[in-house]
């Protein structure tokens, strides 16, 4: 990442139109994430946590918004290339995952019971949910065979997320993203029809044994078991996916009470068992992680960045607006269960999304600036 950042600086210096990158540097979508990084880096001067430098390094990706937005401004076709590449990659992953899950193929270490192809199951399910959302928007925009093709991809991706790959965060991304997009796109009567179909689908999922409901029920049981466990057996009772997230939240709230305004510094969160050597520095909740490390000040900067993303998305043409708002809403919901800005793949994807929004918002403002002169 350090080499990449150095190359980015060279590209910035090579950029001859100094006014363009100065304008971008003053854009809230660019300087707010940079401020988040600066707050985290400055905490190294006042707090000494062993994991602090590594945590700051993981958030270095927040500095990439400016150069990426410059690239998108210099060559708008890169936006199309990125979206196309994202969709093609997910289509290939979907094909391999379906082949493994339905055909019980174990080649290359694939597990038919959890056919994860790309990185971790959470990452694949979230990315597949976002791809399904884009395919859904294209199904509505196209006609004829292309509409049916995109509709088929939406159906297969939805089945893959809900019934095959074991990543509950993907359920959240899919439900929130599609729900927001349909709410913004459809007319009132169409919304009621989709709502009725959604309720029917939920009833069928609840009444019919399936992996999605099994995973959701297990998650609820894990949370309850962790909450009600006595102190002597609390660590063992919380030693599972949702139980650990519950324990993470408890520890995070304790740390926030110690230093609510400015936080405890980078790398201050830790949960584990010293006797076994197990420990994590990630509470799996971006809101809690920001508050623990940078305090309420850092949380406000983070939320202001998210609000600025929504504001920039809302000013785009309806088709782009609805899609970006839906994607942002998916991320906001998933931040409750994972620290997506900390995670590599999910964090880099959001940085690219922020850069896309920054580039599109400046492109939309340029005609307004030049119109008085003509």
Language-model segment annotations:
Residues 5-13, 171-183, 197-201, 307, ...:
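Hydrophobic transmembrane alpha-helices of multi-pass, membrane-embedded glycosylation machinery
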Residues 6-12, 324-334, 341-374:
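Transmembrane alpha-helices of multi-pass inner-membrane enzymes
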Residues 183, 190, 293-330:
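Hydrophobic transmembrane alpha-helices and their immediate junctions
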Residues 185-234, 250-258:
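A membrane-periplasm/extracellular boundary helix in multi-pass inner-membrane enzymes
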Residues 28-38, 50-73, 81, 85, ...:
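Aromatic-anchored transmembrane helix interface
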Residues 234-294:
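Long extracytoplasmic/lumenal interhelical loops at the membrane interface
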Residues 9, 78-109, 119-186, 194, ...:
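Alpha-helical transmembrane segments of multi-pass inner-membrane proteins
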Residues 1-42, 50, 74-80, 84, ...:
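Transmembrane signal-anchor hairpin modules in multi-pass inner-membrane enzymes, especially those
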